[in-house]
Amino acid sequence: MEEEARPAAGAGEAATPARETPPAAPAQARAASGGVPESAPEPKRRQLGTLLQPTVNKFSLRVFGSHKAVEIEQERVKSAGAWIIHPYSDFRFYWDLIMLLLMVGNLIVLPVGITFFKEENSPPWIVFNVLSDTFFLLDLVLNFRTGIVVEEGAEILLAPRAIRTRYLRTWFLVDLISSIPVDYIFLVVELEPRLDAEVYKTARALRIVRFTKILSLLRLLRLSRLIRYIHQWEEIFHMTYDLASAVVRIFNLIGMMLLLCHWDGCLQFLVPMLQDFPSDCWVSMNRMVNHSWGRQYSHALFKAMSHMLCIGYGQQAPVGMPDVWLTMLSMIVGATCYAMFIGHATALIQSLDSSRRQYQEKYKQVEQYMSFHKLPADTRQRIHEYYEHRYQGKMFDEESILGELSEPLREEIINFTCRGLVAHMPLFAHADPSFVTAVLTKLRFEVFQPGDLVVREGSVGRKMYFIQHGLLSVLARGARDTRLTDGSYFGEICLLTRGRRTASVRADTYCRLYSLSVDHFNAVLEEFPMMRRAFETVAMDRLRRIGKKNSILQRKRSEPSPGSSGGVMEQHLVQHDRDMARGVRGLAPGTGARLSGKPVLWEPLVHAPLQAAAVTSNVAIALTHQRGPLPLSPDSPATLLARSARRSAGSPASPLVPVRAGPLLARGPWASTSRLPAPPARTLHASLSRTGRSQVSLLGPPPGGGARRLGPRGRPLSASQPSLPQRATGDGSPRRKGSGSERLPPSGLLAKPPGTVQPPRSSVPEPVTPRGPQISANM
């Protein structure tokens, strides 16, 4: 104690002994104990001092801003004087909670007791009134020692003189009138049995003064200590702030309406009772003067609610003037409360789900926009589906929200929302966390529908994409298509080479992607050169797999590597990229995929555009290498190609065919443009799946069949000879039992029995003897 008081005396008194401490030492000692008198024991002094001071918690930190500010406020309480209570202390919080419950009880019980009970000297009634009067008087005394929050200046008055002056000017008179101990007076003087009727009515009038305690309740609702109590209950029930505040507002509104109905019902009976129930009042007309108080209260409450809700007058219309004025007053109060209730309820409902309301308003504008431009029904449906998948019924201004946050908090939110992308992407799993954060903070969320071309071959690349969910196809000219799924990325090649797109990427399902612009891409890679080398390695491997090269990437790869750890990471990324390409290759190609809004009928023909002459020669070679009549229907893709070739026969420069040939048609051994070599011991099968798609595959030769050569009259076909043979005849070898050609699919691509199919004809009159592989339709 003395050591704490010595530094406060000043630098010149640092050497003063403890017995020569200045007279201010007792005050300093009292301040050190939290403003509690020194006569109290040391442990109790410290406990009481802690209860009277603000504690460090979420609410105090939100009010004062920091731990240091809370400590300064505690020092202010210690130096303010003895028994000064801080308004944000624990003691004041619990005291206000007790007073709040007691006030609510008085606001409900006192009107009923004053109105419907004549004998008020029963023990329960006396105990309740005495207890209430005691707490109200104690609250009146404590208000002189409790700090006052000045809302205008955002400060707290703790000086005793300032507290006293301000309290006397504001709420002292109301609290004094509402705290008059009428029951104490009746008990001590014992005047209640000898009071005549006039004095008894006067005593009842004094009890009505207790209604002014509603002003104290309103004052408590305005103070932040009640809000602090609500916040603590939020943390207990693990509620969000919006939900908890909305629920509390609903209960407050409903409770206020019921309390006003309760008061109005008591007032409807109190006025006739003070007039000794005249003959024209509603109580006398209904003969309820001597009924029980429960029945009287029920009829009075029904009459009051009928007036307040403006649905009638109750059991009968008012007759006397007091009843008429009470009815008008009830209607005015009820209409006001009803309007307030509707307004608050509407605002509350709108605030509960503002994001969904914004989405609905936005979509109404979109519907009006589509109607104004008279968009077709298919386009409207695609727009509707896009909004459903993009926003999912809620709309936020995410850029504005994230822009208002601090950088660490923004990075934390982005890392949390993109945690699924990071978990499924090896590029981020093996990368520096700083690189991952730098990339994630610059990503932009996008949604694509089935059939959308995310990337178009030959266009200038300005973005690269990371796949969060969805399935996409990479369509490269003259190469097998590659499929990408969750955790993959694409579009980085043109950003690295500053060139054009080397392939097209089409969305097969609804895809949720994150895009990275070229400026952000280069800015991130400048900070992390190791990751640039990893991107270049994967890009070169992808180009190598589709049979393309890039001199810029090769030149960059020839430069020495800055470290050995990067090579290991590059190997992991390349291996995972290859494994993923092989893993998704077996997926069903028709999983919701659409091309320009139409289903793909024969997918191997929609990959790389070829010249019509080349396609004609390929089909012609396939037809000449069959061993029997072609078991394909006239509507099959091969027959359609043959017809298209016959129409364009003789043209020196045929246009591009609007379909794409599969990789095996484009690169098979029959696609030679100079001379047809002797085919190996393999058989060409054109199989038609259940969905109507045709696939060409190389299988082994059938039992007993071997490779054959062209006859003496046969000649090789090339792209410069766009003619088909007139007739194709086989060796008549029987088909294997149980082959796919014996089962007819329901898709309409039916193979007619041998001998009924007319051989395809051409402008060339001479027949060609078939030699080589056999083509059959497996259905």
Swiss-Prot record:
SUPFAM superfamilies found in the cross-reference section: cAMP-binding domain-like, Voltage-gated potassium channels
Catalysed conversion reaction: K(+)(in) = K(+)(out); Na(+)(in) = Na(+)(out)
Interaction with KCTD3, as annotated region: 353-779
Alphabetized SMART domains for the sequence: cNMP (SM00100)
Biased composition (Polar residues): 687-697
Membrane topology: Multi-pass membrane protein
PROSITE patterns, per the entry: CNMP_BINDING_3
Activity modulation: Unlike HCN2 and HCN4, HCN3 is insensitive to cyclic nucleotides, such as cAMP or cGMP. This lack of sensitivity of HCN3, despite harboring a functional cyclic nucleotide-binding domain (CNBD), may be explained by its shorter C-terminal sequence, which may alter the normal autoinhibition of the channel. Inhibited by Cs(1+) and ivabradine. Phosphatidylinositol-4,5-bisphosphate (PIP(2)) shifts HCN3 activation to more depolarized potentials and accelerated activation kinetics.
Residue intervals on the Extracellular side: 118-123, 192-200, 274-296, 319-328
Molecular function GO labels: cAMP binding; voltage-gated potassium channel activity; voltage-gated sodium channel activity
Any Pfam family the entry gives: Ion_trans_N
One GO location term (cellular component): HCN channel complex
Main localization of the protein described in the UniProt heading: membrane
Gene3D superfamilies the record matches: 1.10.287.70, Helix hairpin bin, Jelly Rolls
Tissue: Detected in hypothalamus, amygdala, olfactory bulb, hippocampus and retina (at protein level). Highly expressed in brain and heart, in particular in ventricle, atrium and in sinoatrial node (SAN). Detected at low levels in skeletal muscle and lung. Expressed in DRG neurons.
Protein localization: Cell membrane
Membrane topology, Cytoplasmic segments: 1-96, 145-170, 222-252, 350-779
A GO BP annotation: potassium ion transmembrane transport
Chain sites annotated for binding 3',5'-cyclic AMP: G491, E492, C494, R501, T502, R542, R545
Effect of deleting the gene: Hcn3-deficient mice are viable and healthy throughout development from embryonic to adult stages with no overt phenotype. No impairment in cardiac function is seen in deficient mice and pacemaker activity is normal, although there is a change in the repolarization rate of the epicardial ventricular action potential, leading to an increase of both the T-wave amplitude at low heart rates. Pain sensitivity both acutely and following neuropathic injury are largely unaffected in Hcn3-deficient mice.
UniProt cross-references to PANTHER family, sorted A to Z: I[[H]] CHANNEL, ISOFORM E, POTASSIUM_SODIUM HYPERPOLARIZATION-ACTIVATED CYCLIC NUCLEOTIDE-GATED CHANNEL 3
Description of its domains: The segment S4 is the voltage-sensor and is characterized by a series of positively charged amino acids at every third position. The ion-conducting pore region is between segment S5 and S6.
Family: Belongs to the potassium channel HCN family.
Protein name as catalogued: Potassium/sodium hyperpolarization-activated cyclic nucleotide-gated channel 3
Organism encoding this protein: Mus musculus
Name of encoding gene: Hcn3
